């Protein structure tokens, strides 16, 4: 059985301050105990430099704990007249290791289709970034028992355009749309059922990828439900939204992942 290192990725969305970065690293330096889990901070692009400075300033204090930096989005284009966009190379130069791709808010609010998501996935890997690919179903889709159908479609487009082995350097985050930012989380059993489906789907085309890829759960994860979620055999950590803006709650989630 593969030993998949748990991950806790904090997606600040359009929130946060440079002060939050400093506060988080102050607590990381004194509270994070080991490298048994990987911690990723995904602030708005304007704060990437603040997070990078904190990473550099606290390198010794972190004592080998795995704290990385990620972005919330990138352009599928390398350069050009795309006002307001940020390329993969720019993110790489800023110190990012990860980038969130296909978040439900991007798909819903900005019209990102599965084809665009697949292009962004490729752009991330082209520039040495590891994509955190988000997939998930809406409330009506779940009620219609179309959860697996929706997730399979979102996965298959990326596989068709990038190949299965592209997932050797990728993370998947299952984020049920009906749980994102609602305070209503999937039960551990619901999360495990979908994570197992995703792993099986990838295993059918590559047993190695299916066994080794990390699959995060995202959708109203809090310190009160994280232990049960992270204890599921196919749940490898969490993509955290609101709780990532509270340094005490986020640190608690990191500690839970390290003990999972």
From Swiss-Prot:
The UniProt record lists the keyword Cytoplasm: yes
InterPro entries found in the cross-reference section: Aldolase_TIM, TIM_sf, TrioseP_Isoase_bac/euk, Triosephosphate_isomerase, Triosephosphate_isomerase_AS
Pfam families tied to this protein: TIM
Key word Repeat present: no
One BP term from GO: glyceraldehyde-3-phosphate biosynthetic process
GO molecular function ontology, one term from the record: triose-phosphate isomerase activity
EC code(s) of this entry: 5.3.1.1
UniProt-annotated binding residues for substrate: 11-13, 181, 220, 241-242
Subcellular location: Cytoplasm
Pathway(s): Carbohydrate biosynthesis; gluconeogenesis; Carbohydrate degradation; glycolysis; D-glyceraldehyde 3-phosphate from glycerone phosphate: step 1/1
Active site per database record: 103 (electrophile), 175 (proton acceptor)
Source organism superkingdom: Bacteria
Main location: cytoplasm
GO cellular component, one term: cytosol
Keywords of this entry: Cytoplasm, Gluconeogenesis, Glycolysis, Isomerase
Reaction catalyzed: D-glyceraldehyde 3-phosphate = dihydroxyacetone phosphate
HAMAP family recorded: TIM_B
Assembly, per entry: Homodimer.
Family: Belongs to the triosephosphate isomerase family.
Function: Involved in the gluconeogenesis. Catalyzes stereospecifically the conversion of dihydroxyacetone phosphate (DHAP) to D-glyceraldehyde-3-phosphate (G3P).
Protein's name in the database: Triosephosphate isomerase
Organism encoding this protein: Shewanella loihica (strain ATCC BAA-1088 / PV-4)
Underlying gene: tpiA
């Amino acid at each position: 059985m593969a030993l998949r290192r748990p991950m806790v990725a904090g997606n600040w969305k359009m929130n946060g301050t440079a002060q939050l970065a400093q506060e988080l690293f102050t607590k990381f330096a004194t509270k994070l105990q080991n490298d048994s889990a990987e911690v990723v901070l995904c602030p708005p692009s304007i704060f990437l430099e603040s997070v990078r400075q904190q990473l550099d300033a606290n390198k010794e204090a972190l004592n080998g704990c795995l704290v990385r930096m990620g972005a919330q989005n990138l352009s599928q284009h390398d350069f050009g007249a795309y006002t307001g966009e940020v390329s993969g190379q720019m993110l790489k130069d800023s110190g990012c290791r990860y980038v969130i791709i296909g978040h439900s808010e991007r798909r819903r609010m900005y019209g990102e289709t599965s084809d665009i998501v697949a292009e962004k996935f490729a752009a991330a890997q082209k520039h040495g970034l590891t994509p955190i690919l988000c997939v998930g179903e809406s409330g009506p889709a779940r009620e219609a028992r179309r959860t697996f159908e929706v997730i399979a479609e979102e996965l298959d487009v990326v596989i068709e355009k990038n190949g299965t082995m592209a997932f050797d350097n990728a993370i998947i985050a299952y984020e049920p749309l009906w749980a994102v930012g609602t305070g209503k989380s999937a039960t551990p059993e619901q999360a495990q059922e979908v994570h197992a489906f995703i792993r099986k789907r990838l295993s059918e085309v590559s047993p190695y990828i299916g066994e080794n890829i990390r699959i995060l759960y995202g959708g109203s994860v809090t310190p009160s439900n994280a232990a049960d979620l992270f204890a599921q055999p196919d749940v490898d950590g969490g993509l955290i939204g609101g709780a990532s803006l509270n340094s005490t709650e986020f640190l608690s989630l990191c500690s839970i992942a390290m003990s999972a």
